[in-house]
Every structure is written in C-alpha cells, then in structure tokens.
C-alpha cells in the first residue's frame, strides 16, 4: 500500500467519524469567559461597521471618523489604517471624507467595498488596502453593501431607496432596482443571484430576484426595520427600532417568529421604551444568531426546530452602542463594533463606552 493511498484511506476514515465544520457549528454554544474578551481600540469616533476576512485572520472596521482599519485577529495589532479626510477634500484625498456606514468583503477575500454618507462606494484590495475604484451613482448615503458569495458582483443599497448592482472585476455599473418606499437601512446576500433588504419605515423586508427582475415583499415589524442578515439561503433575521428581533423564511410573507423588546426596556416608569436593535448577525448555515443594542449586552439566540422560533441562549457584556456584529466563518469568535453613539445619528451619547471592537471567543459543548 503506497503512503499516499494510506493517507487517503485514513482521511476517508476520519471524514466518516469526525464532525464536519457544519456539525461543529450546530453544537450548543456556551457563554464565553468574560476575561477572554478583548477590546481593540484605534478609531477616534464610534465604529459603524466591520467585516471579517474569509480566513478569519483579519478584521476590517470603519468609523464616523471616516477611517478604515485592518486588524490582525490573533495579535490585535493594527496592520493598516486608511485615514479619513476632511470634508471638501474629496478630489484629492484617497479615502472617505464622510462617515463610513457599511462594508463588505468578497468571499475569496480579494476585494473590500466601503460605503459612506457622501453617496460614495470605494473598492479596495483587501490584502494591501490599496485603493482600486470609486463607484458613484447613488443619490443618498450608501447604507448597505454585499458581495454575492462566490462572485465579484456587488449589491449596494442607499437612502435614495434604490439598490444598484456592480461588477467589480470590470469596474462597471450593471443596473438599478426600485421598490422600497423609504430609505433602505440594510442589505445582505448569499450565493444566489438575489439580495435581501430592510426598508426602514416602509416596514418591509424585500427579496430581490435579480435575474427575474422581480421582488418579494414581506411585512412584519411595526416600526423601522434597521438591520437584516441572511442565516442561510432560505432564512433571515431582522432587528427594528421597536426593540424586536424577527426570524423570516423566504417562503412566508410574515415573520416565523418575533421577540418583542428583545433587549429589554429603559426610561421612567410608565414611559418605558424598548432598546433599539441596531445590529444582527448570523453564523452562516447554522442555527445561531445574535443581536445588539445599547443595553450593555449582545444577545445570542438559537433558532428553534424548523426555524419556527427564537430561543435566548445567553448575553455577553458589551458596553456602548453595538453598531455592527459579525460571526467568523469558523464560528470560533464573534466581533462587535461599538461606539458612544448610534452609527446613524447622535440621539444619545454613552460617555462611559469605548469606541472599538470587541473580539468575543465562542465555545461549544464538547461531544460526548
């Protein structure tokens, strides 16, 4: 028996008995050791958005200070900073001169896309942080960006109520989609030629079938739907400013499950208001999701059997406005982008909060 054949057979045996990465993701999550949570600081103003590289080695974050930082996950070191510029220097500054409020990284880790309040989309080479292209065309702040998985097709959403499709390889605009009746507050996509959006105060979630030039309209939340994330190709999670978190199927026009006041309430007795849900995240192709607000906690949830309901797992102490949440591809850690203010405004200021990134290690129950 040749060594290579022996290795192949051994690998087959291991595959038969070892858990797949997918099965590992479905093991029950345990609350993290708080002492192992790290805070990375570098932005002068609140962190507004973040992405994790597909290999889980790096985090890119952006801020109201208009800067973008590339971090090393293991060491916490700042590897590169793309400085923000002053308003009015757009013609000569390489980078953003307005609050950066959304970003996406291609599934092969080659391209980073960032969008700002000044209607601009910037494309960067993720490895070097070299500026490649600038996309113009939106007539309002760019509020959502997502690369279609397995491609370099980029979807963008804006407060101008439109979605645009771009081909980054060709540095080209493809088409514009219309339908929302209010500003679009969030966008996500998977591997299919479609994207999902949250429509703010038009109270709708929409699934856009790009090739068919059609859209599905879903109704559920009573207030502004502010964030949305794919769980898998069939399900998604949303958060709203009425404090609710909802679980959806692309096959049903109403939520499968809604948790009201998911982060509790605040205010004087009789005048309590729910904490807004400012960020949601999903561990891709698993049953684990997370939500963030400004109640000093990130809440983790398990999607119940058949994705019919949301079960609270545990909360993680995180001080400040949780403006962005992302699970690593492996499911081994969660990153929260936080700030003293909400990413889109200055309604409140939490002076005791730090502007930065919380790296939260995730542990799972060991198999028997």
Predicted regions and their residues:
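Structural hallmark of WD40 beta-propellers
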Residues: 57-60, 109-113, 122, 131-133, ...
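A conserved positional marker within WD40/Gbeta-like beta-propeller blades
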Residues: 67, 111, 120, 139, ...
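Intrinsically disordered terminal extensions that flank WD40 beta-propeller domains
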Residues: 1-45, 338-339, 346-351, 361, ...
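WD40-repeat beta-propellers
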Residues: 68-72, 121-125, 145, 163-166, ...
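Conserved strand-to-loop turn within each blade of WD40 beta-propeller repeats
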Residues: 62-65, 114-118, 157-160, 198-202, ...
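Loop/turn segments within WD40 beta-propeller blades
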Residues: 51-56, 103-109, 115, 145-152, ...
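WD40/WD-repeat beta-propeller blade N-cap
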Residues: 40-47, 84-100, 136-142, 178-184, ...
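WD40/WD-repeat beta-propeller blade-loop signature
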Residues: 36, 46, 55, 88, ...
